[in-house]
Amino acid sequence: LMKTGKFSLFLGGDHSVTIPLHRAFGRYSKEKGLKKIGVIHFDSHADICDTYDSHKWSHACTERRTVEDVITPGDLAYLGLHSYEIEELEYFDAHPEGLVIKAYDVFRDGYLACYKKLEERFKDYDAVYFTLDIDVVDPAFAPGTGTPEAGGLTSREILELTKLLLGNLPIKAMDIVEVSPPLDQENDITSWLALKIIYEVFGCLDR
């Protein structure tokens, strides 16, 4: 799909599905001669453990695999983090060149100010992959996920941030992961939010 050169949207699945997608994005970018590529990762969790439960391909290891052979740590940016493993905090201490925007930053500074940080970081990039874990959204708005964390973004914030990214940065591929209908409420609120995000994504592409 990426070899077509068209925007690609993938739906998971837990966050481990992003590992091969990032690698395909890296290979495609290299074949196209794109020099500057990056990843924007929206999530409650950093997913940058080397191993998790003795497993290196876990959903908690997605970005560790990515910085091994797709991008450098400085080409990775997070938004929405508010739950960490000790190993992940140690990684961030060792690699301050990455951009980390916490969920509290969005609450304190506003989503637009936080978007501006992403825009400043990636405005000169050739291609960016955007991965969106639905648990970045507070479980009041998106309870249907495997590892919900209180204190996340609102549904409006995630929609506006998605539109800003797709409308202004060179997003070449995207995924939405960790939506779990069996864990959702009877009104399917999480699935409806994921569907609304998809609507907004393709609305941006059509402009």
Language-model-detected regions and their locations in the chain:
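Conserved alpha-helical scaffold segments that buttress catalytic/binding sites
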Residues: 1-207
